[in-house]
Design a protein with these regions (language model features):
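Charge-dense, helix-prone N-terminal extensions
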Residues: 1-191
Length: 191
């Protein structure tokens, strides 16, 4: 897939402004993310995904752009596509915060509980045994993990668990999560 129109934003307000004007007319946009070592400001990944969900858009493939940045494609969600568990957690929080737009809610309607149009269906969160064992193996990591917000715990564990079909990624993600949790730091995306 070729990289189309690009957009550089440094905060969620700028991204939300672009989405509010273009979410119904644009087919996609490639958001520019500067690498940390570039020293240039960029919107954090989690903020970008959350704002996209508010308008019924979703992130997809990433590609290198130049020596100091990469790009990620954002586009409207297909009508019958399903939300990942991570995005269900995000949407639940966005609904509670009153940030979801009508367009965003319409795009996820089929993933929502018919009994309550404002509450997405969510599977009960179960921490996989092997991940739990790793977290508990370090008392500092386990203490910090338990103090993180539940939504963050679910998103990060789903991110790790979702890479099981690629064991090298699973190990890399788990190690990175353990390292950051030991420092009591939350993160949005490994680069």
């Amino acid at each position: 897939m070729e990289i189309g129109q690009t957009l550089t934003v440094t905060n969620r307000k700028q991204w939300r402004s672009w989405l509010s004007k273009h979410h119904k007319i644009a087919n996609d946009i490639w958001l520019v993310y500067y690498k940390k070592e570039s020293g240039k400001r960029r919107i954090p990944y989690n903020h970008a995904v959350e704002e996209a969900l508010c308008y019924g858009w979703i992130d997809s493939i990433t590609k290198p752009w130049d020596e100091e940045s990469w790009v990620q494609r954002y586009s409207p969600r297909r009508k019958k596509s399903h939300l990942s568990e991570m995005n269900k957690e995000r949407v639940r929080r966005l609904i509670k915060a009153g940030k979801m737009t009508r367009s965003g809610l319409e795009r996820i309607r089929h993933d929502m509980d018919e009994r309550s149009p404002k509450k997405p269906k969510l599977k009960k969160f179960i921490l996989p045994g092997d991940i739990l064992q790793h977290l508990k193996s370090d008392p500092v990591v386990w203490k910090n993990f338990k103090n993180f917000p539940k939504t963050y715990q679910h998103i990060r564990v789903a991110w790790i668990d979702g890479s099981r079909n690629r064991p090298d990624f699973f190990v890399k993600r788990l190690r990175y999560f353990m390292k950051m949790t030991a420092r009591n730091k939350k993160f949005g995306m490994v680069q």
